[in-house]
Amino acid sequence: MEKDIKRQIQILEIITSEEKWFTTIEISKILRCCNKTIMKDISFIKDFLPEDWHIKIKKGKGVRIYLPYNKHRNEITFLLFRESLTFRILQHLFERETKTIATLAERLYIQVPSILPALKRVENYLKKFGLKLRKKPLRLEGDEVRIMIMYLDLYLKSYNDTEWPFEKLKKEVIFQYLGTLEESLGISLHVVSKRHLSFFIAILLKRKQQGYKVQLNRKFLYFNTETPDYVKIGRIFEKLEREFGVSLTVQDKILLTISIKSSKYVYKDINKEKEESVQYFKEGNLSIYELVKDFINSLEEKLKVDLISDEEFIFALVDYFKRTIYHLQYLCMFERPQKQTIQYMQTEHSETFSAVKEVYTEFVKKNEIADYVSVEEIAKVTMYIEASRLRYTSNYKKVLLVTGESESWAEYLAATLAKRFGDKIQISTVFFAKKSDHDVNADFIISTIPLDLGSTPIICINSIPTERDYTNIQYYLDLQDG
């Protein structure tokens, strides 16, 4: 990204951070540039704003931005990012074939000497995805799946929730197919996952129309073809092939199956899903379930603990691998801030964490799944194991637990609360698509996120509960007992 656009985005982040006046000198000190440059950038941003956004500049006070309450600053940062040559070059290469730098410069209305530094920035952007930019002829080079993931990342940070960057591919049609998929698989996709999936499907279809082919070299990926989900998804995408005039290969269908499985969703009938998953696991007829069994056996041997008898743990691991295992090799492309819950597991359950790290790393290498496993994934498996251990020493009553963290942390937190309060509570976890208007069948709710449910008492706690949180829960339980 060009320095001026990057700086303009930073200015926007500063002036939208608080409802107050910011002096240009104050901003220039933060960004370490001259006052004149800041004034020029603010003038550019002012002309760039939508009609219902306003920037006021007052002598002696500075600059202040007024934006509608239902709008987010990202709407402008998206627009600014799309002005960058990095985006425009990659967008052009996505839309049409351009074989020479001279032709690219001409089509973008830029002089050749001016486009060369931008191409260098594009090369640096591509590096984190393991991709290269070839000059003769001009093209992206690398694994086709990585190219699609790169474009997914690019478009997600360039367009807001209501925008659709694929002119010749109808958004309504793709969303209609996603709705059919939800019905067939018995799931409800998170609204963010629907957007991600719709973009990914559009990118895959566009690349297919241009003649690009997906190659999947890891043997275990083909285990997907044995699963019921693959069969259901395949039937639905036969209609998609006719709609968009493409022919999907086995590799394409596997990739689409993986992208759907690894999305964020909840089961419409969790008990039915749990029963079927445990049954498939015990029958041992599907290769992917045999992989999970091998992993659990290795964990048992290393930790000297019985896990195979815990059906809750079996389902948790099967569901975890269903969502995660297929894209482990691509997770390294995305840097994620380390969550507080991960650090907690590393310190509070260091022995289990170390054992899981050793077993998991050996497992992915032996089965040629990935080269390494991130601490986040190690922590998730650690949470499931510790939740299983806690279940064996806890009795339950009933409470609804709502968290904004991962499913694995919800499992661990539920078991921790059950352990803490003995037979006074039974914990059930739930997924909220919204933060209000949800049918709740519980005496009270324990939540780590704000909720608006007037009919049911709510106790808000921290992601990692404090003694004060435990005291509040105990106080409420005592009130109920009284």
From Swiss-Prot:
SUPFAM superfamilies: PTS-regulatory domain, PRD. It holds the Pfam family HTH_Mga. PANTHER family: CRYPTIC BETA-GLUCOSIDE BGL OPERON ANTITERMINATOR, TRANSCRIPTIONAL REGULATOR MTLR. Belongs to the AtxA/AcpA family. Induction: Transcriptionally regulated by AtxA. Transcription is also positively controlled by carbonic acid and CO(2). Signal peptide: none annotated. The keyword Transit peptide does not apply. This is Capsule synthesis positive regulator AcpB. Keywords: Activator, Capsule biogenesis/degradation, Plasmid, Repeat, Transcription, Transcription regulation, Virulence. AcpB and AcpA regulate cap gene expression and capsule synthesis.
